[in-house]
Amino acid sequence: MVSSKSTSLDALKSLRRLLILIILFILTNVCCENAGWAVENNTEERPNILFLFADDWGRHASVLSKIDGAGGINDVVQTPNFDKVASRGVLFRNAHVSAPSCTPCRSALLTGRHFWQTGTGSILRGAVYDSSIPSFPPLLREQGYCVGYSHKVWSPGTPANSPFTQDESFGKNGGRINQFSQTVTKLISKGTPRETAKLAILDEVRGNFRDMLNSCKDNAPFCYWFGPTNVHRKWIKGSGKDLWGIDPDSLQGKMPAFLPDVPEVRQDLADYFGEIAAWDAAVGVLLDELEKAKLTDNTLVVISGDHGAPGFPHGKCNLYSFGTGVCLSVTGPGVVGGRVVDDMVSLIDLAPTFLETARIKPPESMTGRSLWPLLHSKKSGFIDPTRDCVFTGRERHVESARADFTPYPQRAIRTHDHVLIMNFRPDRWPLGDPYRLEDGPEPTQQELETNTRVTLPDEDAGPTKAWLVQSRKEESWKQLFNKVYGKRMPIELFDLTQDPYEMHNLAGERAHAEVVKKLMNRLLSELYKTKDPRLKNDGEFYETPPMAGPLKEKSPGWKNQKRKP
């Protein structure tokens, strides 16, 4: 006869085993969801990483016309190769940079931190790379990856293209991609057929990538950063139509509210789109070479840009969506493709993503969050409810933008419905002092198109800037000019559901006070949590040399940057 005590003990043991099984089941599913790649792909062979990163390429791709709806300027863009990656991989609809300025954006991307967490690398002119902060290329190198790059990684700044070393640069076949429209136009003028001239440049791109692949020994996985600068101004006027058949008139009626719908600006935008088409052609060459080398199936391909359009209102150096919004698509092993993800993501999320791809645990210093849970998900649209905002900001761009060599400090929080921008020094001109606009002599057309520093120096020189400056006194354009270049309120709030072009500041309206309070609290909480120097001692770190003030000696560039054998 079995005692009741024995029966109770057996029941307890069974219950314990059941609880253990339940806990193991929960932990296994949580790990799979959060670890993404590493759990689902526990193989010996680590994937390669091909990172294609364009200078000054904002949120402009033909595939966006399809997912956002026709009627905008993306109707005119030609990006068949990016579209191909987006269709077979994951396209992120709401991707933003940490800072809409080359060097701080890249500092943030490399380290997986907000730009204000990157020390002396958090400005443009005068930046010094802080190698004490962990970044993904050295971590990959230390774990056996063959790392290399072509063209631009991190600059302007000292040492240039950190944290890569000079012997990890691959460019001996040529770098004419960086002056695409200039080079092709010159070759055509000497009798070279247009398509032949294009192919000559793209062959250089192909050759540099081949050299990088051939440098990798013992079947080591590679990480290659391709960073051409052709999308950055200056480009040849009229080249969008001449080289790519992009008719400026096709933009008529499609321009956003902050861009004048006039021939000069339409042509300028068409030329910008021409350089994007050239960039996309280079992407196609690299994807083709990857396929020929039979490496496609084990290579994570990530394509993006470092901020919005240069030399246009609301673009580069602005915290509006035209300035911080970028294209981002990912495909490769472990990625559940054919999806569009609406979660808010930041390019600081790429560093931990790359490390997890390589089976490396991201260091605790990284603020960004790996994208692998999103890449591994089978869902589309909104996936992770905690990814409901991104944080952006800026400090110094051009050192002489203001006569006293001070920055224009901004921080912002962006959600699906709103963007709130804090302008810490509203007494300053956001895009630089209006040199020679109030006390002459007026800048000439040529100066405005070619010399960024002649006036409003935090916006690149170009035909659009020239047109707006020269039209600023006309009644029909005065209001737009003042909105774009004039001093701004301490707080800006835009309702993106009603005002997608961010033209009407609602911060001062009582009806929106609760939204301002809520977003302000979230923004300040993040800034304090991540120890933003702007909040300490009235921003002393950014207001004093070397982060402010005139520049000193010329950058020593590659000094002492050879990799040790």
Residue ranges and their predicted role:
Residues 528-531:
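Short arginine-rich
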Residues 2-21, 31-32:
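Bacterial N-terminal signal peptides that target proteins for export
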Residues 26, 32-492, 500-521, 535, ...:
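Formylglycine-dependent sulfatase
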Residues 495:
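A contiguous binding-surface segment within folded domains or other stable secondary-structure elements
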Residues 539-543:
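A glycine-rich phosphate-binding loop feature that marks nucleotide/adenosyl-phosphate handling sites
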